[in-house]
């Protein structure tokens, strides 16, 4: 299987098909430290204020910030795979995309999380290279190919040629920062408090980056308590 372990979302592919596309969130029962939900179900528990349940986003700025929670999340997401994809232990071979600016310690953390989650053979690939290969770029040629990959926690900018990174930069700004800006704007401009999921919906509906817009985005009604 191939896994894009993102700050905001995690995608799992098998046989050139997207099998899992879920938020990178895990809900853990505080009494026994057991994961009770991952992905969308765990995301729906955010901001509920239940003391017996902790919702954790194990990745921050593109890297793992909570090793144990990340391991539980990976296991849970693999368990969500349909039975026809999951019946022969899908985690025998795993390819995981990592930020191009990852340190040795961060790479070790990714390896440990995936291996403890069930991977037997693990291969890591830098996110810009995975993105370039995914859209059919020829990164083996002598001409440089440039990729700008905006994720939830980081933006990856890289030029590739002859099968390797020529120059790259990983910036800790991405979709999560856009969400925080939306929350701050609603607070200052409209005296309204909104949650992170609401900010995400606003961004996706009226703020998505599109090459061409035949019509302006429709207005969106937002409801929330006063500050």
Where are these regions (language model features)?
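Nucleotide/phosphate-binding catalytic cleft detector across ATP-hydrolyzing
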Residues: 1-150, 158-227
């Amino acid at each position: 299987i191939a896994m894009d372990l993102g700050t905001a979302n995690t995608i799992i592919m098998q046989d050139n098909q997207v099998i899992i596309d879920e938020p990178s969130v895990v809900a853990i029962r505080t009494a026994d430290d057991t994961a009770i939900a991952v992905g969308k179900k765990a995301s729906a528990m955010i901001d509920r204020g239940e003391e017996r349940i902790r919702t954790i986003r194990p990745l921050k700025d593109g890297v793992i910030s909570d090793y144990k929670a990340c391991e539980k999340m990976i296991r849970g997401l693999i368990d969500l795979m349909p039975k026809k994809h999951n019946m022969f232990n899908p985690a025998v071979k795993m390819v995981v995309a990592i930020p191009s600016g990852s340190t040795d310690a961060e790479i070790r953390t990714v390896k440990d999380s995936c291996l403890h989650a069930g991977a037997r053979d693990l291969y890591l690939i830098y996110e810009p290279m995975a993105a370039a290969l995914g859209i059919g770029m020829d990164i083996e040629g002598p001409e440089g190919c440039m990729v700008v990959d905006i994720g939830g926690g980081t933006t990856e900018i890289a030029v590739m040629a002859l099968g390797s990174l020529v120059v790259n930069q990983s910036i800790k700004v991405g979709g999560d920062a856009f969400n925080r800006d939306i929350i701050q704007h609603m607070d200052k401009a409209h005296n309204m408090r909104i949650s992170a999921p609401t900010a995400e919906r606003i961004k996706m509906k009226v703020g998505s980056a599109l090459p061409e817009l035949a019509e302006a985005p429709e207005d969106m009604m937002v409801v929330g308590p006063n500050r």
